[in-house]
């Protein structure tokens, strides 16, 4: 999965968008991906790199836990503006660059993750309505300032 994503990035002239660091921080909140010992992960900078021509989310993570367990995470780090975060996630999901990459990656689970302030009002639109409209799972993660959420938590069995 990771090598096919890198090939696609090179094909569309976006290979410089790959980040060597699996952590992203903005507005005093953060996200990271800690792969398992045999897992492989890749972070792509979306904002002003993979996508420049429209609203977009901050970054994109791909995580291959095993041959059959492949995950994609669209991530937007936001303060209180929950609805704008969802607009950015939706716009990114529908952008041709993202569609091309996710097509070659073939994740078994695709997540949209909005990291927001713990004080953000997240009742509209409702999570289920957004998921139905966008055909992707949505996780809204309210964080305190200076907290970092590990995306690998979403891959663990409940």
Q: What are these regions, as identified by a protein language model?
A:
Residues 64-67, 97-105:
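Alpha-helix termini
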Residues 56, 69-71, 109:
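A structure-centric signal for secondary-structure junctions around beta-strands
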Residues 52, 81-91, 122-123:
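Active-site-adjacent loop/helix micro-motif of nuclease/hydrolase catalytic cores
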Residues 59-61, 71-79:
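Conserved catalytic cores of phosphodiester-cleaving nucleases, focusing on short active-site segments
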Residues 1-39:
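N-terminal catalytic cores of peptidoglycan-degrading enzymes
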Residues 85-102, 110-112:
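Short, charged, amphipathic alpha-helix that recurs within catalytic cores of restriction-modification
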Residues 2-3, 7, 108-158:
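Domain-level recognition of nuclease-like catalytic cores that cleave nucleotide substrates
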Residues 25-66:
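Active-site metal-binding core of divalent-cation-utilizing nuclease and nuclease-like domains
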């Amino acid at each position: 999965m990771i090598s096919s994503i890198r090939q696609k990035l090179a094909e569309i002239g976006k290979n410089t968008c790959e980040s060597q660091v699996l952590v992203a921080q903005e507005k005093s909140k953060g996200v990271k991906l800690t792969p398992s010992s045999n897992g492989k992960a890749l972070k792509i900078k979306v904002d002003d790199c993979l996508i420049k021509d429209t609203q977009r989310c901050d970054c994109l993570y791909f995580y291959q836990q095993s041959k059959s367990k492949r995950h994609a995470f669209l991530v937007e780090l936001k303060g209180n503006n929950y609805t704008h975060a969802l607009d950015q996630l939706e716009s990114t999901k529908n952008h041709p660059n993202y569609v091309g990459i996710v097509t070659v990656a073939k994740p078994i689970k695709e997540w949209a993750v909005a990291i927001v302030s713990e004080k953000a009002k997240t009742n509209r639109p409702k999570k289920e309505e957004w998921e139905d409209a966008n055909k992707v799972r949505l996780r809204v993660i309210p964080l305190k300032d200076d907290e970092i959420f590990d995306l690998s938590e979403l891959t663990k069995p409940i």
